[in-house]
Swiss-Prot record:
Disulfide pattern: none
Superkingdom of the source species: Bacteria
Gene3D superfamilies membership: Ribosomal protein L33
Protein name per the record: Large ribosomal subunit protein bL33
Protein's organism: Orientia tsutsugamushi (strain Ikeda)
Length: 56
């Protein structure tokens, strides 16, 4: 039997509203708050804030 995975996949959605997203892993036991990164959005050609959303 395989071990149960400790990390979950989360979707980081662009705050610019372009529909661009990144997928990251996080450990819910150690990282209890929502993830938020400043990453590059190629549609806007700028670095914008990406915030966590659920993967459907």
């Amino acid at each position: 039997m395989s071990r149960k995975k400790k990390k979950v996949l989360v979707k980081l959605v662009s705050s610019a509203g372009t529909g661009v997203f990144w997928v990251k892993q996080r450990n819910p036991k150690t990282q209890t708050e929502k993830l938020s990164f400043r990453k590059y959005d190629p549609k806007v050609r700028k670095h914008v804030q990406f915030t966590e959303a659920k993967i459907k």
